[in-house]
Each structure stands twice: as structure tokens, then as C-alpha cells.
Amino acid sequence: MGNVPGKIDQEDSFNDVRPDSSYNTTSSNSVIKQYDEEASSRVRTRRTTSLVNNILNGNNARTKTGSHLSSTSRRKTSREKELAKEAHAKQLVVRCSETVDGGFLAPFGCYSFEKLDYDATVVKNLIIKRKLAPFYTPLQDFDESWTRDELIKIVDGLPLHDTFDENLEEFEDVPIGNLRKSTFNELIDKSLSKKEQRRMHAKIFRARLYKKRILWQENENETFLERKLEMKRIGSKSSNVEDNTSSQPRKNYHLPSDDLKYTLYKNGSECPICFLYFPGPFNYSKCCQQPICTECFVQIKRADPHFPHDEVDPTEPQTNDSEKDPNLLTSEPANCPYCATASFSITYQPPTNRETGIGGMPADSYVYKDAAISRADGGQPNIPAITSDTIRPDWEIKLNKERARLMRRSANATAIHISNRLIDPSHSTRRNTSHSITPIHDESTSASRSPEPTINELEDQMVREAIRLSLEDQDNRKKSKNRNTSLRP
């Protein structure tokens, strides 16, 4: 029966306090009533404590049940997240075979990898459909006095991607092991605590991913250089020897011709944000018609989930974020970096004189045409506007996840607070003892004292909280299921 006193225990307790024959009957009944109240209080406390534990551990119980059925489920989920990050990193590798109008589908590397958290598949599709300017290889500077040959020579020396810092201080002394192996548990110090082991696992994974990105890009760089050398050899042979195989289909190396190189960079301009020189045409802000390169545009995104910035009244106490309603969390659209207009968006009108690469002619077959470069006009209704939400369609999912996390934390804090009031060992004992010692209360004192909630009232409050949490959990699962269904192609 646990800690609840049984009938025999109660009788023994009564025998211990049983008075002699001179002890009056009223006093004996008072002692018996006191023991009954204490026993009943202990039963309620244990029952309510169990209810609190059910509320605190309700979601964990479902997770543990699934883990009991499949011991690898949590590891699989963690591994899936790591594989998704690796797949995203592979999408950011610049490939010489993936070009559109002289640009590429992946960024040159003007910004750090951590800031490239956009949906790479969405961005690539926008570039291929020519709704967004491609990622161009930038020039640090440009001189209008450069001749055609000088400009082509400079462009020939441009790399496919910016250089990596192979000795980052962040990953100094971090083991990476064999990158060909998918697991690296042997690199983790098992003498550390579970929390420290998880931190070490995450750090090793980041270091390994960084090294993999370098290797992936270096492989593409080698392919890029090999194709350059091969095209140069073919060009020198054709200029010295008459080509009798001109009727045979030529191999597409996906490299720009000299005419395309000249066309690209002679009509370029400087991005006002990163101050690098890019070929045109640029993306243009829809609100104030200012140019912005794609490298900079993909950095712009919504603010992280936060509570509204209310005006602070110095006469009133400030409310902590943990006490606020999680449903008040918000995330405003990005503002224009030039004029601060809300809901920043850009438009892009592709060039009409150099449709090369994917969806166009081979880049090495382009012949120079002296035609004006198209410029986007935000006033034209047929030009689609692209926002930061377009390239980060999961912003609402992240906002709802943060709201759910705060709801769970708030519910846990409420349950713990009520639990502490219920299982306080001195709470019911002091109250019951005071009743037995002072059976007659001063009515004026009781009236002035604020009424304490009874055990039954607190139990009812816990039941309502449990029902509310259950309904919220069911509603969140239903919304998540509907959202996943709508996102399927």
C-alpha cells in the first residue's frame, strides 16, 4: 500500500497515543480525526503527484514507447538530419556543367556557409526558369580602359569558387577520422557525460562536413581546369591544322567562349551591398529599383521568431518572455536593405542576347552580338516578384515549432509549480496540526487572510491542464499532418 497507513498501522498508532483512563473522549476523537485527515492528505498528494508526472512525461512516454519498439529510431532520426545537411552542402557546390546565361546555380562563396540556409532546390529552379539572376563569378575591381584581350585574360584566371580556409580555428584539434566512413562514434570520448558526448558529436560532424565541402569543390575545380586545358589544346590545333572532322558533333565542355566572357563582364556593374563587380543584368528591388546580386539576396530573410516589441512602461513590472503567450510569437517579413520598405521583393528580367547553358545554346558556341542588356522593370505586371519567403518556404514551420517548444516549456513550468505546492510536506501538516491545536479560529483573522486553494481545487486545475495539453498536442499533430500533405508534389 506504499506509504499509506493501513488499518493495523493506524491501530498501532492509536495504541501509542492512547491515554490512561483519565483521558477524556473528546480529546481521543480529535486525535483520531487528525490521523484520518493526514492519511487522506497523503493519498491525495500521491495521486496528484502521479497526475503531475503524467503531464510532464506524457509526450516523452510516447517517444520512449517508440524507442522501446525500435532502439535505433532516435539514432536514425539524427542520422537523417545529418544526411539532409550533407545533401544541402552538396547542392552548394559550384559545378562547371550547371550554367545559365554565363552564371552558375550555386554561390561563389562571398558569404559563410552558415548563412546559406535557403532552399537550394527552389533557388536553382528559379535560376533555370530565369526568374532570378544566376550566381556569377565576381571581379574584385573593374577598369573600363581594359581591352578585350585583357578582360578575357582576367576572366580566364577566375576560379570556380572562392578559396576555403582549411585551418579554421573553430575546428582546431577536432578529429575527423576517415571521411569515407559514414559513422565516427569511435572518435567520441566515452568518458564524457552524455551531454558532452552529444556536443562533441555535433562538433565533429560540422568539422567533417566542412572538410567534405572542400573536397567536393576541389574535385569540381579539377574538372574545370582539365576542361579549360583541353579546350585550349583543341583551339590551338584547329588554328594550325585544317579540321577535316567539322561535320562530327563537337563535345560540349560547358565553358564560355571568348565572346561570351567579353559580353558578360564588359556590361557588368558593382553590387551596392557587397561592392563586388558582377555581370548584368542584376536583380532589382521592386520598391525602389535598386540593383542587388543573387549572392546578397539569398542572405536576406525574415527575423527569427520573437515576441512583439511592446513599449515598455517604467511604472509597470516587466513580463519575462517565459510568462508570455507563445501564440504571440511572430516573425516579420524582411525589409528592403535600401529604403526599409516592408515585405522586400525583387524582380529580374533575363538578358535577350545571350541565352546559354541550361535551356539555351552551348556556352562555348556563343558568338558576340552587340545588343542592349535587358533591365528589370518592377512596374511590368508580367515579371514575377521573388521574396525571401520564396526561397525559404519553411519559415512558417519553424515559427510553429518555436511556438510549440515554448508551450511545452510553459506547461512544464506550470505543472512543476503546482506539483511543488501539492507535495510540500509542511503544507498540509502545518494546516492540520494548527486545526488540532487551535480548534477555535478568529473569524476576523480568517476573513482578512487570502483563501488558500484546497487540494481538490488544485487537482481540478491539474486535470484541466492535462486536458488542455492533450487537445493542443492532438491539434498540433493534425496541423503537421495536413501541412505535410499539402507540401507533397
Swiss-Prot record:
PTM annotation (Phosphothreonine): residues: T183, T433, T438
Biased composition (Basic and acidic residues): 461-477
Start and end residues of each stretch annotated as Disordered: 1-44, 57-84, 419-489
CDD domains per UniProt: SIP5-like
Keyword Phosphoprotein found: yes
GO CC terms in record: cytoplasm
Record's keyword terms, sorted: Cytoplasm, Phosphoprotein
Sequence positions bearing Phosphoserine: S13, S436
Main location: cytoplasm
Subcellular location as annotated: Cytoplasm
Keyword Transmembrane on entry: no
Coiled coil: none
Amino acid composition bias (Polar residues), ranges on this chain: 21-32, 57-69
Quaternary structure annotation from Swiss-Prot or TrEMBL: Interacts with SNF1 and REG1.
Purpose of the protein: May negatively regulate the SNF1 kinase by promoting the interaction of the REG1/GLC7 phosphatase complex with the kinase. Deletion of SIP5 promotes resistance to artemisinin, which is probably an indirect effect of an action on the electron transport chain.
Record family assignment: Belongs to the SIP5 family.
UniProt protein name: Protein SIP5
Classification of source organism: Eukaryota, Fungi, Dikarya, Ascomycota, Saccharomycotina
